[in-house]
C-alpha cells in the first residue's frame, strides 16, 4: 500500500478516502459473486430432469400393451411437443400477468397524481375566491371613501399641462468619417487596386522605352561607342550587347564573357543585377554626376554658373575586371568604388584627392 507524502492535515483525508475505496471494492466483489451464483448454469441432467420425468410418466400412462419401436418414438415426440407447448403457454401467462400487474401499478400512480393535481387546483380556486370576496368588500368601502378624492383628482388633471418627451435627434453636421464603414472601405480598396494597376502599367511602359547609351571601352584610353537598349534592361544585358559590338575590333575580348566585364558610371562600379530603370526612377547620383542620364557631356557644371547643375553626364566606362585589379591604385581607377544605394553623393568631384595631398 502506498503511503501519502504531503501535509499532515491531508494525511487523514487521504486515509479516509482509501478506506472508502476498499469498502466499495468489497461491495463490488460481493455483488459480482452473487450475480455469478444466480447465473451459474447447472449440469444438463439437472436442468432437464423434471421435464424428462414428466414426459416418461405421461408415456407410461398412455402406452398400453406391446408397441413397436417406431410407434414408441412417435408417441414420445408427440408427448414432448405437447409438454413444450404447455410450458410455453405457462410462460406466456406469467409474462401477461406481470405486464397486467405493472399496468395496474402505473394506472394507480397516474390516478394518485391526477387526484393530487385536482386537489391543488381546488385549494387555489378556494383561495382565489376568498381573496376576490375580500377584494370586493374592500373595493366597495374604498369607492365610498374615494368619491370626493376622485373629484379633486379630475380637477387637478384639467389644470396639469402634459409634458412632451424630447426625442433624441442626430446632428447631421458631425464628422463620422472616423467610424468604420464597409461600403467606404470597399470603395477605397477598389480605388487603391485601380491606382496600383495603373501604376504597374505605367512602369511597364516606361521599362519598354528605348534609351541610347554612350559608353567608352576603357583599356587605359577611351574608345567611345553607342548602343540602343531598353530602360528595363539590366547592366548584365547591357554588357552582353557591348561585347557583341566590341569583339569585332578588340582581340582580347573574343574569349571574354559578360561576367568578366565591369561598368563604371560617374566613378561608381554598378552591380550587374541593377537595371537602368532603377537609376532613372530613383534619380540616383554618383560621385561626379547623375546616374539617370546616359548621354555625353564633358563637365556636369556650366562654366558661367557653377552652382547650377546640368543633367548631362559622362560616358560610362566598360572595362575588363582584370585590368581594374591591375590598375586600381592608379587614377582614375583609384577613385572608383562599388555603388551603395544608401550612400548620398551631394557634392560632385572630378579631381584625384590622393594626388592633391601629394
From Swiss-Prot:
Residues 124-144 have a biased composition (Acidic residues). It holds the Pfam family XAP5. This is Protein FAM50 homolog. One of its GO terms (biological process) is chromatin organization. InterPro entries: FAM50A/XAP5_C, XAP5. It comes from the Eukaryota. Belongs to the FAM50 family. It comes from Drosophila pseudoobscura pseudoobscura (Fruit fly). Residues 122-152 are annotated as: Disordered. GO terms for cellular component: nucleus.
Amino acid at each position: 500500500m502506498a503511503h501519502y507524502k504531503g501535509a499532515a492535515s491531508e494525511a487523514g483525508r487521504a486515509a479516509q478516502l482509501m478506506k472508502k475505496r476498499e469498502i466499495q471494492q468489497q461491495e463490488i466483489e460481493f455483488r459480482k459473486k452473487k450475480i455469478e451464483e444466480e447465473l451459474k448454469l447447472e449440469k444438463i441432467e439437472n436442468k432437464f430432469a423434471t421435464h424428462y420425468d414428466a414426459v416418461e410418466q405421461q408415456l407410461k400412462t398412455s402406452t398400453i400393451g406391446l408397441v413397436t419401436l417406431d410407434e414408441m418414438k412417435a408417441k414420445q415426440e408427440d408427448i414432448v411437443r405437447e409438454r413444450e407447448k404447455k410450458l410455453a403457454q405457462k410462460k406466456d401467462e406469467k409474462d401477461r400477468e406481470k405486464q397486467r400487474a405493472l399496468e395496474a401499478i402505473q394506472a394507480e400512480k397516474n390516478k394518485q397524481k391526477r387526484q393530487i393535481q385536482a386537489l391543488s387546483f381546488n385549494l387555489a380556486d378556494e383561495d382565489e375566491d376568498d381573496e376576490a370576496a375580500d377584494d370586493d368588500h374592500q373595493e366597495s368601502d374604498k369607492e365610498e371613501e374615494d368619491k370626493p378624492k376622485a373629484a379633486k383628482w379630475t380637477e387637478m388633471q384639467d389644470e396639469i399641462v402634459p409634458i412632451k418627451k424630447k426625442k433624441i435627434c442626430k446632428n447631421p453636421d458631425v464628422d463620422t468619417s472616423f467610424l468604420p464603414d464597409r461600403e467606404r472601405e470597399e470603395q477605397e480598396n477598389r480605388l487603391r487596386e485601380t491606382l496600383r494597376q495603373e501604376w504597374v502599367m505605367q512602369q511597364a511602359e516606361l521599362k519598354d522605352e528605348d534609351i541610347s547609351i554612350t559608353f567608352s571601352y576603357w583599356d587605359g584610353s577611351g574608345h567611345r561607342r553607342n548602343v540602343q537598349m531598353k530602360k528595363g534592361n539590366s547592366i548584365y544585358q547591357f554588357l552582353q550587347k557591348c561585347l557583341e559590338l566590341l569583339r569585332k575590333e578588340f582581340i582580347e575580348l573574343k574569349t571574354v564573357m559578360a561576367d568578366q566585364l565591369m561598368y563604371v558610371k560617374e566613378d561608381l562600379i554598378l552591380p550587374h543585377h541593377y537595371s537602368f530603370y532603377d537609376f532613372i526612377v530613383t534619380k540616383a547620383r554618383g560621385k561626379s554626376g547623375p546616374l539617370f542620364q546616359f548621354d555625353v557631356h564633358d563637365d556636369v557644371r556650366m562654366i558661367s554658373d557653377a552652382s547650377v547643375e546640368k543633367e548631362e553626364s559622362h560616358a560610362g566606362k566598360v572595362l575588363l575586371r582584370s585590368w581594374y585589379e591591375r590598375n586600381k591604385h592608379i587614377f582614375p581607377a583609384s577613385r572608383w568604388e562599388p555603388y551603395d544605394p544608401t550612400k548620398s553623393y551631394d557634392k560632385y568631384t572630378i579631381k584625384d584627392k590622393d594626388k592633391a595631398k601629394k
